[in-house]
């Protein structure tokens, strides 16, 4: 039983470090995107394809 605890503990420890690094990277990206122009561009990127699909669906019928 003790032989299983060591690898599991190691995996847990490495996974925790990995998640911590991912959170730091994500927070850094969010800080970079805090500029209003970039935020508006990102909203437009999400919104325009949806509108395009709706219009093509309506005009195609």
Swiss-Prot record:
Keywords: Amidation, Amphibian defense peptide, Antimicrobial, Cleavage on pair of basic residues, Secreted, Signal. The keyword Signal applies. GO terms for cellular component: extracellular region. It is found in: Secreted. GO terms for biological process: defense response. The modification Leucine amide is found at residue 59. Expressed by the skin glands. Residues 23-44 form a propeptide. It comes from the Eukaryota. InterPro entries: Frog_antimicrobial_propeptide (IPR004275). Residues 1-22 form the signal peptide. Belongs to the frog skin active peptide (FSAP) family. Temporin subfamily. This is Temporin-MT3. It comes from Amolops mantzorum.
